[in-house]
C-alpha cells in the first residue's frame, strides 16, 4: 500500500507556489516546498520528544485548532507512521476512543532547529487520513482515505479544472504570487483538506484564513491579493449582504468590498442560492459551484454562466452515475437519488478500529443521499433525503425550497428569516460558526410572540413553526418542526 510520503513528494517537489499561513497569534508566514518539509521534520522530532514514537498505522485523533498547526501536525504524525483522524475542536465524541492530541502542540516546537531532509525521505509514513461526516445518514460517522485515493482525486479534479474557465483565468496570471487562492475552510473538512492541494498542484499560492468568518475573509482577500477563493455558500451570501449594506449607493458594492483583483469564487458544501450566484457574476466575479461528499470527494463542477445558473454542473466524465427513483429503479435521467460509480475512488468507513468498504448498489454504485433532477447530463439539486419533510398528504418538502422563500430580519444582531411554504410558517436562523445559543433562539421566539400578540394561528397553517430540531442550532443553522395548537402561547408572524 502507498503511504502519505508520496503525497508529500508529489506536492512539494519542484513546485514554485507557496503555502501562506496565519498562526493562532495572527502572524503571517510564507513557506515554500523546502520550508514545509523542514517544518514537518522539526515538528515530528518535537513529537518524538513528547513520547510519540515511530508507529506503523496506529490511529491518532488530531484536534484541529487552526489550519497552520493542523497542517504541520498532520504531516508530522503521518511521517511517524501514524494514521490521522482530523477532528473539529468542538467535538468530544471520540476523545476516549483514540489517542488524542491538540494541534496546538505545534507551537511548542522550536522551528529554527537544525534539520536533515534526508531523514524525512527515509520514513515510512502512515497510510490513512480520516474525517467526520454526517454523510447520507444524518448521524456522524468516520470516513478514511488512503493516499492512492487522495492522489487520484487530486489528479481528476485538476484535469477537470484545466478544461474549465477557472484555468483560463489562472493562465492570465502567470506567477504563483499572482494566482493566490484563499482557503476559508478548516482542514478537518474534506473541502478544506483537498482543495488547497488541488490548487497548489496548479502552481497557485495557497493562503489559509486564520478566522473563518466573513470579516476575516474580506480582510484576507484584500490584504493578500487574492485571485480566487472557495468556501461554503452561506459565507458568500453573508458577504453579499454586508457589501450591499456597507455600500448602499455603489453601482457595484461587492467590488467595493472585495477589490478589483478577485476573479474566482468557488462555492461548495451545500446548495448556493441562485440570487447569490447572479449577484457575484453581475459584479464581474466568476462564480463556480461544485458538488461532492466526504465519502467520495468531488463529483461535479459548474460553469460561471447566467444561462446555467441553477445547475451544479456536470458529473466528471470519468465517473458513471444513475438516478435511483422511488421504486428502486436505476435510470439515466429524471428525478431521484443520485448514485455514483467513481470506479474505486471511495473513502472507507472507519468502524470498529478498521477501514471497511462502503455499501454499494450492485457492488459499484454509491448512494449519495441527495435528490437531484438529472437532465442533459447536468445536476439540479432538490434536497437531501435526511432533510426531507413529509407533509400530511405525503408530499416531500425540501428544506432548501423553504429557505429560498424566506425574508431576512434581525433581532439583537442575530439574522433570522420568517416566511411561508405551502401553508407552513417557517423560522430559519443563520448560525454560521455556532455562535448562537439556545437562549438566543428562545429570545427570538419571545420577540416574535411579543410583536404578534394579536395574531391567531390560522387553521390552514397546520399549527407548525419550523425552527431547529430540539431547539439546538447546528453550526450552519437549520430547520425543524415544532407543533403548536390553537391554545399555544406562541403566536406566529403574519406571512405573505
Task: Label each residue range with its predicted role.
Residues 1-21, 38-39, 123-128, 495:
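A short N-terminal helical cap/helix-turn-helix that marks the beginning
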Residues 18-54, 67, 95, 147-148:
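Conserved AMP-binding/adenylate-forming core of the ANL superfamily
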Residues 29, 46-90, 183-184:
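Conserved AMP-binding/adenylate-forming
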Residues 32-33, 128-162:
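Conserved AMP-binding A3 loop
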Residues 155-180, 187-252:
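Conserved AMP-binding/adenylation subdomain of ANL enzymes
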Residues 226-231, 240-309, 412-414:
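Gly/Ser/Thr-rich phosphate-binding loop
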Residues 306, 314-315, 329-364, 378-379, ...:
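Conserved ATP/PPi-binding loop(s) of AMP-dependent carboxylate-activating enzymes
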Residues 342, 369-456, 495:
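AMP-binding/adenylate-forming catalytic core of the ANL superfamily
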Amino acid at each position: 500500500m502507498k503511504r502519505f510520503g508520496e503525497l508529500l513528494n508529489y506536492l512539494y517537489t519542484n513546485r514554485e507556489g507557496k503555502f501562506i499561513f496565519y498562526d493562532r497569534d495572527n502572524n503571517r508566514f510564507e513557506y515554500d516546498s523546502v520550508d514545509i518539509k523542514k517544518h514537518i521534520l522539526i515538528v515530528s522530532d518535537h513529537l518524538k520528544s513528547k513520547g510519540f514514537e515511530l508507529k506503523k498505522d496506529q490511529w491518532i485523533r488530531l484536534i484541529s485548532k487552526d489550519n497552520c498547526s493542523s497542517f504541520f501536525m498532520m504531516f508530522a504524525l503521518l511521517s511517524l507512521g501514524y494514521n490521522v483522524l482530523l477532528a473539529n475542536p468542538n467535538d468530544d465524541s471520540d476523545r476516549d476512543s483514540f489517542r488524542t492530541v491538540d494541534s496546538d502542540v505545534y507551537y511548542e516546537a522550536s522551528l529554527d532547529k537544525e534539520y536533515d531532509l534526508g531523514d524525512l525521505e527515509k520514513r515510512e509514513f502512515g497510510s490513512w487520513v480520516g474525517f467526520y461526516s454526517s454523510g447520507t445518514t444524518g448521524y456522524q460517522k468516520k470516513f478514511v482515505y488512503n493516499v492512492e485515493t487522495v492522489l487520484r482525486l487530486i489528479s481528476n479534479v485538476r484535469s477537470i479544472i484545466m478544461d474549465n474557465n477557472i484555468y483560463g483565468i489562472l493562465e492570465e496570471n502567470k506567477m504563483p504570487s499572482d494566482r493566490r487562492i484563499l482557503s476559508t475552510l478548516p482542514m478537518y473538512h474534506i473541502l478544506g483538506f483537498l482543495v488547497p492541494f488541488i490548487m497548489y498542484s496548479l502552481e497557485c499560492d495557497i493562503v489559509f484564513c486564520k478566522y473563518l468568518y466573513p470579516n476575516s475573509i474580506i480582510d484576507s482577500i484584500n490584504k493578500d491579493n487574492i485571485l480566487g477563493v472557495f468556501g461554503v455558500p452561506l459565507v458568500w451570501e453573508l458577504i453579499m449582504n454586508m457589501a450591499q449594506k456597507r455600500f448602499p449607493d455603489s453601482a457595484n458594492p461587492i467590488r467595493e468590498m472585495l477589490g478589483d483583483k478577485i476573479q474566482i469564487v468557488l462555492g461548495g458544501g451545500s446548495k448556493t442560492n441562485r440570487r447569490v450566484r447572479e449577484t457575484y457574476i453581475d459584479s464581474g466575479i466568476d462564480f463556480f459551484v461544485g458538488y461532492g461528499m466526504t465519502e467520495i470527494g468531488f463529483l461535479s463542477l459548474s460553469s460561471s454562466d447566467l444561462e446555467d445558473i441553477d445547475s451544479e454542473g456536470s458529473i466528471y466524465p470519468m465517473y458513471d452515475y444513475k438516478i435511483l427513483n422511488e421504486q428502486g429503479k436505476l435510470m439515466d435521467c429524471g428525478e431521484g437519488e443520485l448514485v455514483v460509480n467513481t470506479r474505486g475512488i471511495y473513502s472507507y468507513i472507519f468502524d470498529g478500529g478498521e477501514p471497511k468498504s462502503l455499501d454499494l448498489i450492485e457492488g459499484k454504485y454509491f448512494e449519495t443521499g441527495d435528490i437531484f433532477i438529472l437532465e442533459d447530463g447536468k445536476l439540479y439539486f432538490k434536497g437531501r433525503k435526511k432533510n426531507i419533510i413529509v407533509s400530511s398528504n405525503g408530499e416531500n418538502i425540501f428544506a432548501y425550497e423553504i429557505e429560498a422563500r424566506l425574508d431576512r430580519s434581525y433581532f439583537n444582531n442575530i439574522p433570522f428569516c420568517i416566511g411561508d411554504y405551502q401553508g407552513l410558517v417557517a423560522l430559519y436562523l443563520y448560525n454560521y460558526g455556532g455562535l448562537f445559543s439556545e437562549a438566543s433562539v428562545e429570545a427570538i421566539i419571545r420577540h416574535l410572540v411579543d410583536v404578534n400578540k394579536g395574531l391567531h394561528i390560522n387553521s390552514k397553517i397546520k399549527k407548525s413553526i419550523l425552527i431547529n430540531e430540539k431547539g439546538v442550532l447546528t453550526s450552519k443553522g437549520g430547520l425543524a418542526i415544532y407543533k403548536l395548537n390553537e391554545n399555544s402561547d406562541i403566536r406566529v408572524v403574519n406571512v405573505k
